[in-house]
Amino acid sequence: MKFLQIIKHLKLQNKKNALDNFVNCRTYEHISNINKLFLNNFSSTKEHSEHGQVKHENFLNSTLKYEENSQNGSTNNLKNGKYNMYVSEGNVNINEEKYKDNNISSNNTQYNNNSSNSGSLNDEGPLWKEHIDDVVNENKKKKMNRFYLDSQATTMIDPRVLDKMLPYMTYIYGNAHSRNHFFGWESEKAVEDARTNLLNLINGKNNKEIIFTSGATESNNLALIGICTYYNKLNKQKNHIITSQIEHKCILQTCRFLQTKGFEVTYLKPDTNGLVKLDDIKNSIKDNTIMASFIFVNNEIGVIQDIENIGNLCKEKNILFHTDASQAAGKVPIDVQKMNIDLMSMSGHKLYGPKGIGALYIKRKKPNIRLNALIHGGGQERGLRSGTLPTHLIVGFGEAAKVCSLEMNRDEKKVRYFFNYVKDYLTKHLDYIVFNGCQINRYYGNMNISFLFVEGESLLMSLNEIALSSGSACTSSTLEPSYVLRSIGISEDIAHTSIRIGFNRFTTFFEVQQLCINLVKSVERLRSISPLYEMELEKKNPSNDDIPKFIWT
């Protein structure tokens, strides 16, 4: 699709606004997503904010009331374990009307623009109905439009973030550590402004508390290895770490590396909801314990740990507390002061920022937390992470944090709304499904569902136009069942039937509807050829007395 056609279709008034919309297309060949994405999120006027960002459009109604449809409904238990089994016979009635109003307004006025020219999901005008470039197969036959629902793996960059980054990728190119001229000062100021934005997001107190890294993996390695090696050098008796069995791979592999260096690691098993019990943590703390590390929001099942009480316990026992907040920062409220968090890892591309940038929060307190560096060189980042700072990535990370701090509440309402809609729809149309993880203490942008008698990989293949996953993006290339699901007591057979759905800021109601419709169709089709499902139905309905019974000898 040519650039001028995009301008004509969106009825934009200038090329600046057109570019802002064009750069955020998921792929150039799938321009049809502009309808479902931009016409719901961006205005088509000439107005821009102070730095030239496109002002954000209202696209959900904050007056909507959401049902806390957590663990209610018709519930059965499997013979092999305790799971929430939602069956179609349950009293689940979907009020379709409450899902039609998808016009949520935001309390944030900085990015709002109440333009009457913008489209909406229920818009009857030609802008909404007309598709520019539907995805076609090799035979030039129309297929379902592709869309993205794997937001725990990564998120698309917000156009406002990209708009903020562009000057630092072109004409503002100074090294932030070149303090002898204006070019360096300009970049240094941009970096410090980004630190401030991150601090505001998590309620930090000092710019020196933020150390920029290449991502959450490096931040986690720096936190665990840096802390353990430093304090072990001061006191050889200090060599114990506490974590859980459902951490991200980068935490688990780092702990295994430390075990090869003589450190002792306790891996706590969560309960069936995916929550680590405080009593288990308390009983695991020993005199030689250095630190505890627990993930804030689990990347596979979306469960939120009781971070505040864990932080208070660690403070009481005088041990350091680290949390991997790569899935939490910008999505759920974080207060590092109230939660007594000593170290926290964050990632840019998980909160609508660029890839290749992350941060480690290190609380400045008395005595200050000290740790050894992993990368040595010019002494940047207080000597903890040497190397020239990628100014454009840091600026994008900071702007993404700023946008999240302003729009977090609206984003949370939106994904909770989609979560409840999908849950209601599936429980009405399908039986033998399991919603994995706690359904109350969770981030609602993450859904992990097991469809019994359907192989998860087969389901993903049948939905190949919808970007979903069967678990963590770091391990989904293997056919092994999710270690997170196995750790919360789910059998291997059921773990193989699970898929993960990830909603985000740019997910539209149209996409959620298409997901539900195609999920039900695919599950029913795959179950129709499943002998295990047929056997299960025969067990439930043993009324075929007229059928002759054969005895094999």
Swiss-Prot record:
Annotated pathway = Cofactor biosynthesis; iron-sulfur cluster biosynthesis
Catalytic activity, reaction form: (sulfur carrier)-H + L-cysteine = (sulfur carrier)-SH + L-alanine
| Domain of life of the source | Eukaryota
Q: Where is the composition biased (Low complexity)?
A: 102-122
Pfam families listed in its UniProt record: Aminotran_5
Q: Please list the GO biological process terms of this entry.
A: cysteine metabolic process; iron-sulfur cluster assembly
**Family matches, as InterPro entries:** Aminotrans_V_dom, Aminotrans_V_PyrdxlP_BS, PyrdxlP-dep_Trfase, PyrdxlP-dep_Trfase_major, PyrdxlP-dep_Trfase_small
Which keywords fit this entry according to its UniProt record?
Iron, Iron-sulfur, Metal-binding, Mitochondrion, Pyridoxal phosphate, Transferase
Q: Where is this region: Disordered?
A: 102-125
User: Could you tell me where this protein is found in the cell?
Assistant: Mitochondrion
Identify the cofactor(s). Answer: pyridoxal 5'-phosphate
**Entry's Gene Ontology molecular function annotations:** cystathionine gamma-lyase activity; cysteine desulfurase activity; iron-sulfur cluster binding; metal ion binding
Q: What is its EC number?
A: 2.8.1.7
Looking up Gene3D superfamilies in the UniProt record yields: Aspartate Aminotransferase, domain 1, Type I PLP-dependent aspartate aminotransferase-like (Major domain)
Say yes or no: keyword Iron-sulfur present.
yes
SUPFAM superfamilies named among the record's database cross-references = PLP-dependent transferases
Q: Which GO terms describe its cellular component?
A: cytosol; mitochondrion
Physiological role: Catalyzes sulfur activation and mobilization in iron-sulfur cluster formation (ISC) pathway for iron-sulfur (Fe-S) cluster biogenesis. Active when in complex with a partner protein Isd11.
Its subunit composition reads: Homotetramer. Interacts with Isd11; the interaction enhances cysteine desulfurase activity of IscS. Interacts with IscU. Component of a complex, at least composed of IscS, Isd11 and IscU.
Q: Which family does it belong to?
A: Belongs to the class-V pyridoxal-phosphate-dependent aminotransferase family. NifS/IscS subfamily.
The identity of this protein, by name, is Cysteine desulfurase IscS
Q: Upper lineage ranks?
A: Eukaryota, Sar, Alveolata, Apicomplexa, Aconoidasida
Gene (UniProt)? IscS
